[in-house]
Regions:
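Local sequence-structure signature of Cys/Sec-based thiol-disulfide redox active-site neighborhoods
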Residues: 1-25
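Hydrophobic aliphatic residue packing
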Residues: 31, 48-50, 71
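Non-catalytic, surface beta->alpha helical segment in thiol-disulfide oxidoreductase systems
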Residues: 53-75
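Thiol-based oxidoreductase modules, predominantly thioredoxin-like and allied folds used
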Residues: 7, 27-41
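Residue-level signal for short segments within beta-strands and strand-turn junctions
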Residues: 22, 50-52
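A domain-level signal for the structural core that forms small-molecule/cofactor-binding pockets
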Residues: 1, 23, 27-29, 33, ...
């Protein structure tokens, strides 16, 4: 399983925490973190994908448990 976490500058620690949570749940998962930077300081993005399917996308972060549950729903 390949998970992409696309995040803006302020969400890096959240993205790293999610990577750890996903690896704890599925040790064989690959998690790619991709920083995204906008043209303004107010740019915010937190997006989670399984392969090419977006399962969460927002200008704010949600908790890891919610994301893990969204992944489980797609499996």
């Amino acid at each position: 399983m390949l998970i992409y976490v696309v995040y803006s500058e302020g969400f890096e620690s959240n993205a790293k925490s999610l990577r750890t949570a996903v690896k704890n749940e599925w040790s064989d998962a690959s998690v790619n973190l991709m920083g995204a930077y906008g043209k303004t300081d107010s740019f915010a993005k937190y997006q989670i994908q399984i392969n090419k399917d977006i399962i969460y996308s927002s200008e704010s972060v949600t908790d890891n448990t919610t994301i893990i549950n969204l992944i489980k729903e797609r499996l």
